[in-house]
Swiss-Prot record:
Residues 1-20 have a biased composition (Basic residues). Gene3D superfamilies: Ribosomal protein S20. This is Small ribosomal subunit protein bS20. InterPro entries: Ribosomal_bS20, Ribosomal_bS20_sf. GO terms for molecular function: small ribosomal subunit rRNA binding; structural constituent of ribosome. The keyword RNA-binding applies. The keyword Coiled coil does not apply. Residues 1-29 are annotated as: Disordered. Binds directly to 16S ribosomal RNA.
């Protein structure tokens, strides 16, 4: 089966073993934050498509917090975070002006 990952060897040095333990925790935390980011962005996009400007602006404020957290932790580059916030901000503002 091609989908099975090859088993990794256990590190010999104590520092390597510690690093492996930390990697598991960090991977779980990063995956969780990345998922929270995707959900926040999707919720704002849905609100914009639905035309609900109050909900869109409320969700956008929460999304900004999530994006800033992810950029601060280095999961995404700060420029990507700024770009995503800018694009969604433009959509929310366009919705407010249209209505």
């Amino acid at each position: 089966m091609a989908s099975a990952k090859p088993k990794k060897k256990n590190p010999r040095l104590a520092s390597g073993r510690k690093r492996a333990r930390q990697d598991v925790k960090l991977n779980a935390a990063n995956t969780s934050l990345r998922s929270k980011y995707r959900t926040a962005v999707k919720n704002v996009e849905k609100a914009v498509l639905a035309g609900d400007k109050t909900k869109a602006s409320e969700l956008f404020a929460k999304m900004q917090s999530v994006v800033d957290t992810i950029a601060d932790k280095g999961i995404f580059h700060k420029n990507k975070a700024a770009r995503d916030k800018s694009r969604l901000s433009a959509k929310v503002k366009a919705l407010a002006l249209a209505a």
